[in-house]
Amino acid sequence: MEIKDQGAQMEPLLPTRNDEEAVVDRGGTRSILKTHFEKEDLEGHRTLFIGVHVPLGGRKSHRRHRHRGHKHRKRDRERDSGLEDGRESPSFDTPSQRVQFILGTEDDDEEHLPHDLFTELDEICWREGEDAEWRETARWLKFEEDVEDGGERWSKPYVATLSLHSLFELRSCILNGTVLLDMHANTIEEIADMVLDQQVSSGQLNEDVRHRVHEALMKQHHHQNQKKLANRIPIVRSFADIGKKQSEPNSMDKNAGQVVSPQSAPACAENKNDVSRENSTVDFSKGLGGQQKGHTSPCGMKQRLDKGPPHQQEREVDLHFMKKIPPGAEASNILVGELEFLDRTVVAFVRLSPAVLLQGLAEVPIPSRFLFILLGPLGKGQQYHEIGRSIATLMTDEVFHDVAYKAKDRNDLVSGIDEFLDQVTVLPPGEWDPSIRIEPPKNVPSQEKRKIPAVPNGTAAHGEAEPHGGHSGPELQRTGRIFGGLILDIKRKAPFFWSDFRDAFSLQCLASFLFLYCACMSPVITFGGLLGEATEGRISAIESLFGASMTGIAYSLFGGQPLTILGSTGPVLVFEKILFKFCKEYGLSYLSLRASIGLWTATLCIILVATDASSLVCYITRFTEEAFASLICIIFIYEALEKLFELSETYPINMHNDLELLTQYSCNCMEPHSPSNDTLKEWRESNLSASDIIWGNLTVSECRSLHGEYVGRACGHGHPYVPDVLFWSVILFFSTVTMSATLKQFKTSRYFPTKVRSIVSDFAVFLTILCMVLIDYAIGIPSPKLQVPSVFKPTRDDRGWFVTPLGPNPWWTIIAAIIPALLCTILIFMDQQITAVIINRKEHKLKKGCGYHLDLLMVAVMLGVCSIMGLPWFVAATVLSITHVNSLKLESECSAPGEQPKFLGIREQRVTGLMIFILMGSSVFMTSILKFIPMPVLYGVFLYMGASSLKGIQLFDRIKLFWMPAKHQPDFIYLRHVPLRKVHLFTVIQMSCLGLLWIIKVSRAAIVFPMMVLALVFVRKLMDFLFTKRELSWLDDLMPESKKKKLEDAEKEEEQSMLAMEDEGTVQLPLEGHYRDDPSVINISDEMSKTAMWGNLLVTADNSKEKESRFPSKSSPS
């Protein structure tokens, strides 16, 4: 931490309280008024005024339990007297434990529930010839922003670095200054009156300067946004009015009907020398002190603040910054500065109850909850500024922030500061420049461990959360009843059915729909084309479009997880090829046998649903998921590049080009020298002969259809050279990939407003496709385009839309079909459930639950329907589903400056999937539009989807570690807990399995691919012998244990909890010399009192107090 100007800073801001003045207030409430109250008048009051401690009648004071306070704090409350320097006596009760106790208590009212805080630091500014005013110099939502020296702009948000000395001085201010908790006030004037009355009563402020300090506090506040908004149309007045109206029910209206105590009004003016009873609590109302001499009335203050044109009477609001403040946030105002007429420091910490909108005090129109006032003599402005930064930074600390809301007295606040000091990290002064602004981190560590007490074994009392989510939950528990899991899925998803449609009203859903429609169209049509080639047109592109649309619509409407996108898979295509070849060799009807197999497969899948077989998904861990997902992503990338290279066969390049012979290059269509029998038969059917055809006048497509030959220097192998088309296709391909990735990252760009960046990022891929289509159309190069069937009818005329399972095949084929159906069932089950597991991971923070059984049922039913109609089978597509989820990610719209938006979850709805497949079915009628989309653009989209889906896969992060020195490796959580050699061993095993899957996938044995995916589960089980359970918990998900093992673990946990409870009930008595068994456990409050810095503060304070007692001020109270 920063330590500077120590000579000036060693002088304390406040003298320490001694026995003659006041003992450090260990009570919950102190009245600043010298008025006698009866006990029954004081009980049950919430307002706390922590100030002077004056014993009554020589009676030894004791702490009393408040009716709404803590119930178990006797050991702290019964310490009535402290040391002269304000320190508590040594104790093993550490600040961390006290803070955990404070945060663990629950108040009966909602008034002390913590809210988000906006903190503003204002400093009083004096200029010659001008009236003084409060100027905003810094603000905090999460990180610090300063007004730059020029005063024209805000700095970038940065992590606040504080000097240790300023934190010590802040602690001294809270210990010895005025602390007013739960003050009832409606205006800044009332707050100033109460604070100054407290200061005068306690002898911290002279009566003759009270009026001048009050005037200083009433000075107008000038905020940084006022200058740049001064000339704008005051439309923002309505926004301020909204904030005012939201706050008035909690401020003016609530207090309007309060009855002022008959003793409270004259208390300040007349009874200043009376002795107040300890624990006195006074409910100050808005009329308190309003008639005192020298005070400015609220009306007078309003007249002074409302100078200027009418449109400036309501302060301008920075709407852009206002959007970053969370709903329900409150303000804490820090007021520091130098006053020439002060000879000692005025310090006050105020908590309002309820929070009140103080017009003109904060930059934004939100209710103020806390005020910290620090005014002192000239010459210590920088010191005051650093203390103001310290309290503002503390207010942004998650733990102290909660302590400030729940504190019952001064000691609670001091404990919060001590706990903060116990957690801070100190930077050596010789190795760090404090003027360097630290950039906000991308991820801020959780502070929950600071709030939860620890048990003897070092873990949190409430248990340590798993490092990452597995697949446990009610969705995967066996019910023991037929269709029990399916019934629970329906009950779980039914309440969200209508919200699945309402939640889709967002531009993000429109962007996702347009992007994925283009992404899904091409593979469906391509798959149909390949299937048509393999089955001689029995199932082709039109059947593929119709089947995908029908299956997708049904699944999107009634599926358990509508975020899953259905598509075609490679193993299905391999199975279709093998089946067609088998039927052709044995003279069987392919479509009929396929229908029988499909119906058996659907029946077996329904049996799996009835027996809750989806509960076996819990054995699919991250190890299997990542291997499967990585393979599919790599296949997408590989096939995209393969399709691009295949264009070189259709549009070849002359690799032996000679620029000097360009005038001699030509390519002509000639009669084939030796036409094949098929060619001659085709000519005869068309009533043509070789002599009837004028070969030299034929176009390229006509020459190809008549099986002519290309002759000439500009001809390749069966095609003319077309270099511009291939090169242009390559340009389109890589431009699509680059532009998609760039626009997707545009959300984090520094250009344009946030809303524009967000829209561009959501529509990134669609905008890319649109731009590439326009550019391709403008250039005019005939690149290959998307071909969509233009007529809705079966590809072959000899088949209809329905197929009988038996057909012309023998009867026994229906029974024999169960054998290949078993293999198909494994294929469908593994593809569907692994994809569902990836989509339903806890990292996605899905709130509407999942439905593994319902998903499998819908896939099984539609598989049976597609089999009867002779349509392709569709199952969950991994990459398309991951892309769908990534396109619907939700992030916090209201994030503090410098804070990374928080991932909130996924926009769960059914509309995007539904619209994708509805439009896909309508594509037959949109061929006039779709024919403009170049195929290289869609190949580029495939590559982008495959590459973007690899992000977040831990396997590739671990692969990078092989080439990184240890000192340059990222701070992955598993590297902290698992030896690097074990991490590498885990990665090698996973890469070996991935390589084996790849070999099987691209070979003729691709039909057994699902069996190999299933084998990964057993490989993972064998890894229990190579790695410990703890190592696997960090590198992978833990697999379910046997019932006996679970019972043993439960017994061990119960024993540990019993030991923890016994330990909590044990009373530890310190030995002589305060010996501690564990040297790592210290009390920061006790250790701080032993430091020379704190001691110097106390010694100087005592000297200052002694000097003041020798030469008392005339106006100081007796």
From Swiss-Prot:
Cell compartments where the protein resides: Basolateral cell membrane; Apical cell membrane; Cell projection, Dendrite; Cell projection, Axon
Tissue-by-tissue expression: In the brain, detected in cerebral cortex, subcortex, cerebellum, hippocampus and medulla (at protein level). In the cerebrum, expressed at high levels throughout the cortex, at lower levels in striatum and not detectable in the corpus callosum (at protein level). In the cerebellum, detected at high levels in the molecular layer but at very low levels in the granular layer (at protein level). In the central nervous system, detected in neurons in the olfactory bulb, cortex and cerebellum (at protein level). Within the hippocampus, abundantly expressed in CA3 pyramidal cells (at protein level).
Induction: Repressed in the brain by chronic continuous hypoxia (at protein level).
Catalytically driven reaction(s): 2 hydrogencarbonate(out) + chloride(in) + Na(+)(out) = 2 hydrogencarbonate(in) + chloride(out) + Na(+)(in)
InterPro entries per record: Band3_cytoplasmic_dom, HCO3_transpt-like_TM_dom, HCO3_transpt_euk, Na/HCO3_transpt, PTrfase/Anion_transptr
Stretches in topological domain Cytoplasmic: 1-509, 560-562, 618-626, 742-762, 831-855, 934-935, 1020-1118
Topology of this chain in the membrane: Multi-pass membrane protein
Main subcellular location of this protein, as a coarse class: membrane
The keyword Transcription regulation appears for this protein: no
Modified residues (Phosphoserine): S89, S276, S1057, S1085
Post-translational changes noted in the entry: N-glycosylated.
Transmembrane stretches, start-end: 510-530, 539-559, 563-583, 597-617, 627-647, 721-741, 763-783, 810-830, 856-876, 913-933, 936-956, 999-1019
Phenotype when the gene is knocked out: Homozygotes are born at the expected Mendelian ratio but most pups die around weaning. When fed soft food from the second week of life onward, most pups catch up with the weight of their wild-type littermates and survive. Adults display normal weight and lifespan, are fertile and do not display major behavioral abnormalities. However, brain ventricle size is drastically reduced and mutants show diminished Na(+)-dependent recovery of pH following acid loading of choroid plexus epithelial cells.
Family designation: Belongs to the anion exchanger (TC 2.A.31) family.
Domain observations: The N-terminal cytoplasmic domain is likely to have a high level of intrinsic disorder.
PANTHER family named in the record: ANION EXCHANGE PROTEIN, SODIUM-DRIVEN CHLORIDE BICARBONATE EXCHANGER
Role, per record: Sodium/bicarbonate cotransporter which plays an important role in regulating intracellular pH. Has been shown to act as a sodium/bicarbonate cotransporter in exchange for intracellular chloride. Has also been shown to act as a sodium/biocarbonate cotransporter which is not responsible for net efflux of chloride, with the observed chloride efflux being due to chloride self-exchange. Controls neuronal pH and may contribute to the secretion of cerebrospinal fluid.
Protein name: Sodium-driven chloride bicarbonate exchanger
Naturally occurring in which organism (per UniProt): Mus musculus
